[in-house]
Amino acid sequence: MFTRILVPLDGSAPAERALEPAIRLAKHFGGEVILLRVVVPEPVLVALPGLSPRPYDVYDAELRRDQEEAEAYLSGLKLQWHGAGVALHAEVLSGTPAEMIVDVAQGRAVDLIVMSTHGRSGVNRLLYGSVAEAVLRGAHLPILLIPLDQ
């Protein structure tokens, strides 16, 4: 039933709470798990009189560094869960998290997305939005949300 499960991660402990249920489901159904880390590029400033934007080479170097850190993070998780008896794949992309999650889910024929909520509310939710909510609206497939412990 669920043979390809996508687990989006942001590097936080709450996000990693989705790993165990995803791996258990994949093992039960004989499936695989795709670990996804989306690196959010910093906005590039346009030069205005009296202001100097960061040079593009600095921007590119920072993005490369963030991608390398994300790859190392996912490699560590794959190593940690190596003995779970499930095929684990890792993917690092750059972009808007919700859009990239939906794109990967569609492009890789994912059967289920398992992700954690961060429990943001009020001003934090207004400022940062809800990736989980955007994925719910954009992905047309089953999604298992793991709530943040209260």
Label each region the model flagged.
Residues 11, 125, 148:
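Short, conserved catalytic or interaction motifs in soluble domains
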Residues 6-7, 33-35, 73, 112-116, ...:
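Short, structured motif recognition centered on aromatic/hydrophobic residues
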Residues 131, 139-141:
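Short, structured coil segments at secondary-structure junctions
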Residues 50-54, 107-108, 131-132:
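Short, hinge-like loop/turn segments at secondary-structure boundaries
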Residues 3-56, 84-89:
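Small/aliphatic-rich secondary-structure junction motif
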Residues 55-72:
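A short acidic, glycine-rich active-site loop
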Residues 1, 14, 28, 76-113, ...:
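Structural beta-alpha unit
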